[in-house]
């Protein structure tokens, strides 16, 4: 099944992340397991982050709330891909941004909404007023069944 069709079929963060891992393994021959996803109320200028040395990915709930459809899935894919690359040990932000774009371009094609998401980010539809909010409480929420692991793995 083509990757775009798989993304369209994705039901949740775990399905999208499985696709992220497939792209990275196929393109870079890199792979890791045991990651956990948290949704948090981050400042609107932050899409997500991976605390180095952890198994955690933290996604900004505020940027993605109330969004649906393929555009939403494309942004989630691009953000999770970016943070997954960090979790694999790539720490240079510019290098990771370029690699995120290249992987999306190579795997989805130039006209894909996933490639567009790597260029615009989830901030494209925000207004100036959205950025004027006070800093929120982080309020982390663990996303259950995020990583689909084939075979056994002990956390």
Regions found by a protein language model. Give the residues of each.
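Metalloprotease/metallohydrolase-associated module, dominated by Zn2+-dependent proteases
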Residues: 1-58, 65-67, 91-155
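A generic structural motif
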Residues: 63-65, 84-85
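Residue-level marker of regulatory loop/turn positions in helix-turn-helix DNA-binding domains and
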Residues: 69, 73
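Active-site recognition of the HExxH zinc-binding catalytic motif
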Residues: 74-90, 97
């Amino acid at each position: 099944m083509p990757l775009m069709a798989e993304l369209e079929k994705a039901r949740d963060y775990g399905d999208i992340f499985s696709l992220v891992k497939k792209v990275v393994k196929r393109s870079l021959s890199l792979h890791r397991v045991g990651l956990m996803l948290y949704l948090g109320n981050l400042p609107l200028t932050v899409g997500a982050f991976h605390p180095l040395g952890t198994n955690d990915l933290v996604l900004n709930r505020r940027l993605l709330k109330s969004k649906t459809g393929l555009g939403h899935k494309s942004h989630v894919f691009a953000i999770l891909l970016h943070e997954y690359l960090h979790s694999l040990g790539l720490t240079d932000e510019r290098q990771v941004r370029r690699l995120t774009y290249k992987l999306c371009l190579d795997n989805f094609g130039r006209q894909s909404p996933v490639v567009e998401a790597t260029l615009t980010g989830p901030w494209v539809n925000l207004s100036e007023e959205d950025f004027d909010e006070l800093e929120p409480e982080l309020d982390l929420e663990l996303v259950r069944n995020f990583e689909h692991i084939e075979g056994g793995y002990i956390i």
